[in-house]
Amino acid sequence: MRFRKDGVGKITPILVATPSDKVRNGPYVWPKGPYKHIQADKGRPETMMWSYVRKNGGRGFGFTGGHKHLNWGNDNFRKAVLNGLVWIAKAKVPKNGIKSSVSVEELKQNLDPKGKRK
């Protein structure tokens, strides 16, 4: 991720990791890479979850990890996102975070039917 550097607010990284060279080489993007500007950043940590505070006090929260639906079954995954939502609402985030639970059956409810992969 690239963020503005012109002082319009403050980005605070929450979740940062360094993608493998395999990821940088492009099979996980659409349209499929590789892309030179992505490969040029090999070894560079990437921010995947962040908070943002505007100069006027407004808050934002971003996360690039919502692509795999079953990840929502992970308690810590949900907790991080729920904590971010509570924080942007300027409510108090509990010391141990927002607790929630979801079953596999609940995760599978109301999913759109998928066609065959080509």
Walk through the language-model features, giving the residues of each.
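Extracellular low-complexity, Gly/Ser/Thr-rich intrinsically disordered linkers
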Residues: G58-R59, G73
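Short amphipathic C-terminal alpha-helix that caps PH/PH-like domains
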Residues: F77-I88
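Long alpha-helical segments found as membrane-embedded helices
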Residues: R54-G58, K92-K118
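Active-site rim elements
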Residues: Y35-Q39, G66-D75
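Cell-envelope and extracellular/periplasmic
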Residues: G66, A89-K92
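Phosphate-centric recognition/catalysis
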Residues: F63
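Catalytic beta-strand/loop cores that center a nucleophilic Ser/Cys/Thr
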Residues: M1-N56
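Short conserved micro-motifs at the rims of enzyme active sites and ligand-binding pockets
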Residues: R24-P27, W72-N76
